[in-house]
Amino acid sequence: MRSRRGLLIVLSGPSGVGKGTVRKELFSHEDTRFQYSISVTTRKPREGEVDGVDYFFKEREEFEEMIRNEKLLEWAEFVGNYYGTPIDYVEKTLQEGKDVFLEIEVQGAIQVKKAFPEGVFIFLAPPSLSELKNRIVGRGTETEDVIENRLTVAKEEIDMMDAYDYVVENDQVELACERIKAIVVGEHCRRERVAKYYKEMTEGL
């Protein structure tokens, strides 16, 4: 049984925890029907990232115009770059009964929760801070100063997990995906999500 309006599913966590890897693995599963909401960012593309697939890559001036025109559900500045979520796309997709999947930074997730408290907020946690550092170093794209900055921010973000509905440890990507899928199935069956549909159905009898 599924609720008729789509769910807004927000996956968030520290930089380097593997949000992108988990999201790509989830979307490779045939039994998932998520609609990925592509974020807008001003950071430079990493190797293998494609504009319009992984992110919409914008210049700072373009992003700031979107802020002024209130075209973003949320936005945040993280390590010198902007990140944001286009609002019109999200609401339209939810109304169509599709689940919208957001993979965003922690600051952005907190903003989204204020605007969409009925969303499903999942904090992706690392097995340990040492493992998180290994993953960031393994990218080979960050300077030592940036790595240390990201770890400092990560500690602050882990302290913010109380704002989330669920915490999923990313010890193994496949296991993390199965946990997230189980969360979504359960959320679709929550009484408060399906009650309105059945109330309308019985009123028509």
Swiss-Prot record:
UniProt-recorded Gene Ontology molecular function terms: ATP binding; guanylate kinase activity
Protein name: Guanylate kinase
Gene3D superfamilies xref list: Guanylate Kinase phosphate binding domain (3.30.63.10), P-loop containing nucleotide triphosphate hydrolases (3.40.50.300)
GO cellular component term, pick one: cytosol
Recorded catalytic activity of this chain's protein: GMP + ATP = GDP + ADP
Source organism of the structure: Bacillus anthracis
Function, in words: Essential for recycling GMP and indirectly, cGMP.
Compartment(s): Cytoplasm
Disulfide links within the chain: none
Enzyme Commission code: 2.7.4.8
PANTHER family tied to this protein: GUANYLATE KINASE, GUANYLATE KINASE-RELATED
Membership in a protein family: Belongs to the guanylate kinase family.
Amino-acid positions noted as binding ATP in the UniProt annotation, renumbered to this chain: 13-20
Enzyme class: transferase
Keywords on record: ATP-binding, Cytoplasm, Kinase, Nucleotide-binding, Transferase
Domain Guanylate kinase-like: 6-185
